[in-house]
Amino acid sequence: MRSEITRETKLLFDLPQDVIEEIFSKVPVTCLRRIRSTCKRLYALLKDRGFIRKHFAKSARQYHALMLKNFRFYSVSFNPNGTEMDVASLFNGERSLIDPYSSSEAIISQAFHCDGLLLCTTKENRLVVLNPFSGQTKWLQPQNRCKIDEAYVLGYDNSDLCHSYKILSFPDLYEQELETIKNAGRDLDVTPEGDLELKTDDFSSNSWRRNLGVTPHGGLGLKIYDFSSNSWKKLDVITPEGCLKSYGVSLKGNAYWVYMSKRRGVNDYSLLSFDFSTESFQHLCVPFHQEADCFGTMALSVVREEHLSLLYQSCETLKVEIWMTKEIDTTFVSWKKFLTVDLEPHLPHLLMFSCRMSFFIDEEKKVAVCCDRDNKVHVVGEDEYRVSSGFYFLDFEGITCCLTVFGYVPRLV
């Protein structure tokens, strides 16, 4: 069998170079990864930037669901009738990532997707950017080791012809925010009949405000890592005062969060964006009522690197609404509704998604695959609700890895 592969490969490379490039430019990235080691000429071709540009322009970029589970990446797929979910290791048993500073396998606890790249945080609190299909990595220097109480998002400067990647670092005060809300008088109870009761006190506008750019000790907490200079710098910009209600996501170089502030004692929601070109923030509209209940769940996802998707679940009705952007730029966004699901009939299996949830949209089957801190996978659609509970939770030397799912479009570089 080995000789047959070698002979076929040799015959292929007897063809003119432009014909070879044309053939391989139509092969999906995931297949190229599997065959690149068959010969040196093919390996060199896949490293050639001219071929990479041609492949990017001509190939249909496949849309995948990736899952971070137990410190490793997996691909997620459904069987043809959509009743079962298959989870397969992305690296097929290979060691996923080697830390060059310790020469041991890197244990990944968090991941952020941008443009086919994964910004990963390891258990040693180091940052590495990984292309899981090409195997390329970029590690930040050890002296730039990240902090446990910081969050990171990856984006790029759209003003450059070639993407100039940057990392935004900001204080992750989620646990402090929870404690502040708890002390402010929030109680969450379930009655004997299974109803959800929410008791709140009146909050003044300053009682549980979180400033995105100010650390608990008062100093500016925003920093930018520029890949072109391989260095960090402090970011001196006007930062919004309020609360991030979702994980961040990246679309076409910009980062986005669901954001909440108080205006005259009333909750005010918006889509907060960070433009890596101008290194500034911008507020955009959200599709649901801006005065939604403050304990509802909001989450963002990216669909095919073309649209943002926003999930909103009311804590009063448990109804889930999922929206997708029709258009989005730096100053304008329009939305269309993708899905509405009432989860109340499925109690007591599910009460409320947390604001640390993640989800993936399957447009063809019109379902959302949701992961939460209970380490279960919830599949919700207009006429269905399923939960997969066969996922176990690992704790590695005190570092946890919550189940996370996101859409992913692979790229060669």
From Swiss-Prot:
<feature type="domain" description="F-box">
    <location>
        <begin position="9"/>
        <end position="55"/>
    </location>
</feature>
<dbReference type="Pfam" id="PF07734">
    <property type="entry name" value="FBA_1"/>
</dbReference>
<dbReference type="InterPro" id="IPR001810">
    <property type="entry name" value="F-box_dom"/>
</dbReference>
<dbReference type="InterPro" id="IPR011044">
    <property type="entry name" value="Quino_amine_DH_bsu"/>
</dbReference>
<protein>
    <recommendedName>
        <fullName>Putative F-box protein At3g17560</fullName>
    </recommendedName>
</protein>
<dbReference type="InterPro" id="IPR036047">
    <property type="entry name" value="F-box-like_dom_sf"/>
</dbReference>
<dbReference type="InterPro" id="IPR006527">
    <property type="entry name" value="F-box-assoc_dom_typ1"/>
</dbReference>
<dbReference type="InterPro" id="IPR050796">
    <property type="entry name" value="SCF_F-box_component"/>
</dbReference>
<dbReference type="Pfam" id="PF00646">
    <property type="entry name" value="F-box"/>
</dbReference>
<dbReference type="InterPro" id="IPR017451">
    <property type="entry name" value="F-box-assoc_interact_dom"/>
</dbReference>
